[in-house]
């Protein structure tokens, strides 16, 4: 039989297939090959009625995230708070390039809008992201229809209200929430093991644990691909390997001058590019010392 792993707990993998859930284990040959099944995996498995089954094969994954590990994700809701902590477009763009690089559709959700004296500044920023092609929403009513027919995970820095949002989406989850520490400006980690939960016509991961910004973008070409607006414009650059920094006849810099390109995003691109180049130089020095 074929199914999807929807929960992993204490060495057992719970596989959903044709409306039923089967408790399975992974055969020893997976350990020998260094393979581990993850929540989201499409698998072949064997199972008798009312007895423990076994995973026989794991299908290739289209994407993955770590800490906690989930695979084959359709979209990720990036939660950014309007206040406490303050909205940070640089941090948002770091989440977005991570998701773009992993071929996971991003949805931007702004929490704590009620703490603002005026929502206009956030809404103006939202229009910029919407012009790029991103879903940018500020209310639960806007978010819920986007969950249908999708496997969705939630991510964001500590304290933005991930657990609170998940509890509003699916109150049955009863996730523990952590209040912001005034002294640190950060929330307590209050996550638990991951599993999928059916709600609003889709599946959501019942952990708000994704706050890591680890990404393996190693060069300017990959970074360019992670910015949709740069990716579209780069086909018009004179040089195929254009980094949009110093090259002549660069379509990205031309769009910046005409106002077609949002300067904030270009500034973040340059910053991220510099970080990538610095990491590469550091790596070269380490290798040279060896």
Curated annotation (Swiss-Prot):
PROSITE patterns: ENGC_GTPASE (PS50936), G_CP (PS51721). SUPFAM superfamilies: Nucleic acid-binding proteins, P-loop containing nucleoside triphosphate hydrolases. InterPro entries: G_CP_dom (IPR030378), NA-bd_OB-fold (IPR012340), P-loop_NTPase (IPR027417), Ribosome_biogen_GTPase_RsgA (IPR004881), RsgA_GTPase_dom (IPR010914), RsgA_N (IPR031944). It is an enzyme of class 3 (hydrolase). Binds 1 zinc ion per subunit. Residues 62-213 form the CP-type G domain. It holds the Pfam family RsgA_N. GO terms for biological process: ribosomal small subunit biogenesis. GO terms for cellular component: cytoplasm. It is found in: Cytoplasm. Keywords: Cytoplasm, GTP-binding, Hydrolase, Metal-binding, Nucleotide-binding, Ribosome biogenesis, RNA-binding, rRNA-binding, Zinc. Zn(2+) binds at residues 237, 242, 244, 250. CDD domains: S1_YloQ_GTPase (cd04466), YjeQ_EngC (cd01854). It comes from the Bacteria. Its EC number is 3.6.1.-. GO terms for molecular function: GTP binding; GTPase activity; metal ion binding; rRNA binding. Belongs to the TRAFAC class YlqF/YawG GTPase family. RsgA subfamily. Monomer. Associates with 30S ribosomal subunit, binds 16S rRNA. One of several proteins that assist in the late maturation steps of the functional core of the 30S ribosomal subunit. Helps release RbfA from mature subunits. May play a role in the assembly of ribosomal proteins into the subunit. Circularly permuted GTPase that catalyzes slow GTP hydrolysis, GTPase activity is stimulated by the 30S ribosomal subunit. HAMAP family: GTPase_RsgA. PANTHER family: SMALL RIBOSOMAL SUBUNIT BIOGENESIS GTPASE RSGA, SMALL RIBOSOMAL SUBUNIT BIOGENESIS GTPASE RSGA 1, MITOCHONDRIAL-RELATED. This is Small ribosomal subunit biogenesis GTPase RsgA. It comes from Streptococcus pyogenes serotype M3 (strain ATCC BAA-595 / MGAS315).
């Amino acid at each position: 039989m074929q199914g999807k792993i929807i929960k992993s707990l204490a060495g057992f993998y719970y596989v959903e297939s044709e409306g039923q859930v089967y408790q399975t284990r992974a055969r020893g040959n997976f350990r020998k090959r260094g393979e581990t099944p993850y929540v989201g995996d499409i698998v072949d498995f064997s199972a008798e009625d009312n007895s423990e089954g076994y995973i026989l094969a794991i299908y290739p994954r289209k994407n993955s995230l770590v800490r906690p590990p989930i695979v084959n994700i359709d979209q990720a809701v990036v939660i950014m708070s309007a206040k406490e902590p303050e909205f940070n477009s640089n941090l948002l763009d770091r989440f977005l390039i991570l998701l773009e690089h992993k071929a996971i559709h991003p949805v931007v959700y702004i929490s704590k809008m009620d703490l603002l004296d005026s929502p206009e500044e956030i809404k103006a920023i939202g229009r910029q992201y919407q012009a790029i092609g991103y879903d940018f929403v500020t209310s639960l009513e806007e978010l819920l229809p986007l969950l249908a027919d999708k496997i969705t995970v939630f991510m964001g820095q500590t304290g933005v209200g991930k657990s609170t949002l998940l509890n509003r989406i699916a109150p049955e989850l009863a996730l523990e929430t952590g209040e912001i520490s005034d002294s640190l400006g950060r929330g307590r980690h209050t996550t638990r093991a991951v599993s999928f939960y059916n709600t609003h016509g889709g599946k959501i991961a019942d952990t708000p644990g994704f706050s890591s910004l680890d990404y393996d973008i190693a060069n300017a070409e990959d970074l360019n691909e992670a910015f949709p607006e740069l990716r579209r414009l780069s086909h018009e650059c004179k040089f195929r390997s254009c980094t949009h920094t110093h090259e002549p006849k660069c379509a990205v810099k031309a769009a910046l001058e005409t106002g077609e390109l949002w300067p904030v995003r270009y500034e973040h691109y340059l910053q991220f590019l510099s970080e990538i180049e610095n990491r590469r130089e550091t790596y070269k020095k380490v290798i040279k010392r060896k």
